[in-house]
A protein has these predicted regions:
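Asp-based, Mg2+/Mn2+-dependent phosphohydrolase catalytic module
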Residues: 1-8, 14-41, 53-76, 80-138
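Conserved phosphate-coupling serine/threonine residues in phosphotransfer and NTP-handling enzymes
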Residues: 47-49
Length: 138
């Protein structure tokens, strides 16, 4: 089963700074994550010290403090922090939400999306149409 890890900050509205006890979720992000869950993808919220609001937590199968060092199977990580793309497991595809990193950046994410909704569409497409390893008919 494919898992999608999502930072609370990536799925939240701009309000609710670092000192907020609960960061309010972006409604379109919640809708996109619910669509992933309804499609059979396991959605996991990565709290990292920021408590998700009830709506965001309700769409998740689990809330964890950090992404596991080695995911159990194919997995994606949606984050708004480019530093979290570095050092990720080869089994974990990272998607940066927001602006693309500056050219020449030493930190590399596997993909960049304007928002969680665009990231969800990319994930759904990749799950539905995985790359073929076959060179073709023989």
């Amino acid at each position: 089963m494919t898992e999608v890890y999502v930072d609370v900050a990536a799925a939240s509205m701009e309000q609710g700074g670092a000192g907020a006890a609960v960061r309010p979720a972006e409604p379109e992000a919640v809708r996109a994550l619910r669509y992933l869950a309804d499609s059979g993808i396991r959605v996991v919220i990565v709290a990292a010290g920021i408590r998700p609001d009830a709506e965001l937590e309700a769409v998740a199968a689990e809330v964890v403090d950090a992404v596991p060092a080695r995911p159990r199977g194919p997995a994606w990580y949606i984050t708004s922090d480019i530093a979290r793309c570095r050092g990720a497991s080869a089994r974990l595809r990272t998607v940066l939400i927001g602006a693309a990193p500056p050219s020449g950046s030493v930190r590399r994410c596997d993909a960049v999306a304007r928002d969680v909704q665009a990231a969800a569409m990319e994930i759904l497409a990749a799950v539905a149409m995985p790359p073929t390893t076959d060179a073709g008919p023989t």
